[in-house]
Amino acid sequence: MYEQRTYRRDIKAGDLVSFQAAVKETDLYIRASRDLSVEAVAAINDVRGPLERYIREHPVFLHSLEPLPVEKDAPDIVQRMAQAARLANVGPMAAVAGAVAQMVGEKLLQSSAEVIVENGGDIYLKVSRKRMIAVYAGDSVFTGKLALEVEPGRTPLGVCTSSGKVGPSLSLGIADAAVVIAPSAALADAAATAVGNMVKTEKDVDAAIEFGRSIKGISGIVIITGGKMGAWGDIKLVKT
């Protein structure tokens, strides 16, 4: 069934070419200096292949809700996901969308100086001018009113969102949006899940922010739940 992804309009980058690339469950919305859809599909296959083979041999990797050790010779994507999961204390699949977005983006940077890859609301970007990323929080009063301003010198960067109310990804919390910024999109993805899991009521926002601050490698957090918002870190929120 097709799921309308309204948040895909929420990055201001009209000077770049937009295109989609999909393989199986992976459905990416990409912006680059030119249409790289063929290259993007090839990159997705290159990234997914080793992960799929690893999961066939280690099915626990797919289902675990806790960090798992992996072999030193495990595929790069598995290593990235496992490391992010250890830092955030979640299962490795909590990092998969961010990891795929980043690894595909890194491959596309060979053909484009600027790349923005969105994978289910999780974003990897390397840009050469200031970009605005709208904060999408479902039916919250904050949706459509706030954006993250990202300076090019801070990229490459991961900007990932976990929600207990929007999207298909597993969340044990009820946050409208738990947004985490980190140089590693895999870590941002895993940490967004961990932070979002802590939010059961509006009263949990401050504690979730404090927990997120303790995760090594995180540079910024925004949590929106109902009428409450909390933020921390090296971020710039602007009104839209």
Where in the sequence are the language-model features?
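Flexible, glycine/charged-enriched surface loops at secondary-structure junctions
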Residues: 55-69, 114, 201-232
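Short beta-strand scaffold segments in enzyme catalytic cores
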Residues: 30, 122-126, 221-224, 230
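Conserved, well-ordered active-site substructure
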Residues: 233-240
